[in-house]
């Protein structure tokens, strides 16, 4: 039986999903990031899932799909989904409030279909470019809001002691200004780490392993997580935002036609493999700020340039404190349990769809094996 549900300017929450996460839903909250009035971009992200359970598998099929978080720089304005599932609903009932479309099928035999259309509006988030910090000074006494404090804590993949703390101290030295400390960490990550296209997906972001091994290579989750862990170890709240590219980079494409996202002349892009992780850090007395050291390394490799190259340095400067929003973020979840709970336990992150057949996961890193396809179309 075909089922269709449509949500506009809001999302439908399950009864369980109305319960906020205990760690983050406190009475004192950080101010939302501010975005100067700029032209907004509009995209439709169309997702097609035809789940492909492994041969011989049987049993209940469950699918968790990450949906965009609403912020000052991006909003999910509409959501529609249809398919032959038995149940499907949206929930945020997890520690990070990660917005999730959950669907189930009673058995893995036969077609397992769901189509999802997401309307998204974005605005470039450029606080440093817009000189938003020109009057900022670090408070004499730094007190973080309760919903920011969790982003100082370690997780399984982002520890803040041992080699991480040792490295952070070497990078920041005697610097006390939190913005300058964040910049030192960002510069270290973008200049010392290298992109490795052989890494599966976006990388695992296992910071302790990366630093202990001395092999400072990986992909976007690896770079972003190293930045996050080093920042937290330095007393600066930081977090990853897992998401996906949506199309052409209007501003940064002058430096690379391929590194930052692309689309055809009609604004259509196949983004099935376009997952990308970015990072944010928090300044007391101001709020959250964006950065993206991983895309510096991606551009450097794509264009076969050194870090000292003028174009690389221009990108490096822009991506500390600014994001071009031909991309959308899903959630900040790291080392956490989805809802409903998976058989496999805590997720490293939730930047990809996740599915289980009778408790066994399907390879979400391979769109063809899973299988899913994503097409983003910019509305002009």
Q: Whereabouts are the PLM-identified features?
A:
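N-terminal export signals
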Residues: 5-27
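Active-site rim recognition segments
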Residues: 248-252, 256-380
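Acidic low-complexity segments
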Residues: 93, 115-195, 201-214
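Intrinsically disordered, low-complexity N-terminal segments that are enriched in acidic
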Residues: 30-126
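Short intrinsically disordered coil segments
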Residues: 79-82, 130-140, 293-296
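Active-site neighborhood of thiol-dependent amide/isopeptide-bond enzymes
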Residues: 174, 178-182, 187-277, 299-302
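Secretory-pathway-linked proteins and extracytosolic
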Residues: 104-159, 340-380
């Amino acid at each position: 039986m075909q089922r269709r549900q449509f949500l506009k300017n809001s999302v439908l929450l399950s009864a369980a999903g109305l319960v906020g996460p205990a760690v983050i839903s406190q009475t004192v909250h950080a101010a939302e990031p501010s975005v100067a009035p700029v032209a907004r971009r509009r995209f439709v992200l169309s997702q097609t899932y035809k789940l492909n359970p492994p041969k011989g598998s049987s049993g209940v099929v469950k699918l968790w799909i990450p949906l965009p978080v609403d912020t000052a720089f991006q909003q999910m304005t509409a959501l529609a989904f249809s398919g032959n599932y038995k149940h499907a609903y949206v929930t945020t009932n997890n520690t990070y409030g990660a917005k999730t479309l959950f669907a189930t099928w009673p058995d893995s035999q036969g077609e397992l279909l769901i189509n999802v259309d997401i309307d998204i509006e974005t605005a470039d988030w450029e606080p440093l470019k817009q000189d938003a910090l020109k009057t900022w000074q670090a408070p004499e006494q730094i007190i973080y809001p309760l919903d920011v404090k969790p982003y100082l804590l370690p997780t399984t993949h982002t520890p803040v002691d041992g080699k991480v703390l040792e490295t952070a101290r070497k990078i920041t030295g005697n610097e006390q200004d939190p913005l300058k400390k964040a910049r030192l960490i960002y510069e270290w990550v973008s200049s010392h780490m290298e992109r490795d296209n052989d890494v599966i997906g976006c990388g695992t972001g296992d910071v302790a392993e990366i630093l202990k091994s001395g092999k400072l290579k990986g992909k976007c989750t690896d770079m972003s997580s190293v930045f996050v862990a080093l920042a937290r170890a330095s007393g600066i709240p930081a977090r990853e935002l897992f998401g996906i590219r949506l199309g052409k980079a209007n501003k940064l494409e002058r430096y690379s036609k391929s590194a930052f996202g692309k689309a055809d002349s009609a604004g259509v892009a196949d983004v099935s493999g376009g997952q990308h992780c970015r990072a944010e850090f928090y300044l007391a007395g101001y709020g959250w700020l964006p950065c993206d050291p991983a895309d510096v390394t991606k551009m450097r490799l794509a264009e076969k340039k050194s870090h000292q190259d003028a174009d690389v340095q221009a990108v490096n400067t822009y991506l500390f404190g600014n994001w071009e929003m031909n991309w959308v973020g899903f959630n900040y979840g790291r080392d956490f349990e989805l809802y409903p709970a998976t058989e496999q336990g805590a997720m490293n992150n939730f930047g990809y769809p996740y599915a289980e057949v009778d408790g066994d996961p399907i390879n979400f890193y391979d769109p063809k094996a899973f299988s899913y396809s994503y097409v983003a179309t910019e509305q002009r």
